[in-house]
């Protein structure tokens, strides 16, 4: 597998709709950087967040997930409590080609503040807004800035198309819009 460069990412965004909306340059003045980089794409976080809370004494069970585990916030700056967690989604909608796997890595500025972003791989054929998981590993409240860069996607091109894509197997997170909570089917 090869890591794909800016020229390839731009071409796939423009001809295939791989990233929408697509920012064809790196924007970084006064904000967490976002847009096209040399070998990746820095995606923005939307302004809708779900922040873990224990107000309702909920238990986190991935097989029977309670919406009472979160409080919803729509804001330009999300404050994640100490040692807590929040969900959000990307501003960008992704459509991954059948011969590509996308891997997400965190932003160094957030990581240096104890904020970890986790996203599982974007499988070949997958489409949707990416649900982002933010962990505040510090004993202090931490800020996430909406509509600014949150993570970077790196695109790996396979030698050929896969036999069965995420779309072919009717993956449970296909075509997600906004924040999608855990699903066990």
From Swiss-Prot:
The keyword Nucleotide-binding applies. Keywords: Hydrolase, Nucleotide metabolism, Nucleotide-binding. GO terms for biological process: dUMP biosynthetic process; dUTP biosynthetic process. Catalyzes the deamination of dCTP to dUTP. DCTP binds at residues 107-112, 131-133, 152, 166, 176. PANTHER family: DCTP DEAMINASE. This is dCTP deaminase. Gene3D superfamilies: 2.70.40.10. HAMAP family: dCTP_deaminase. The keyword Calcium does not apply. It holds the Pfam family DCD. It comes from Wolbachia sp. subsp. Brugia malayi (strain TRS).
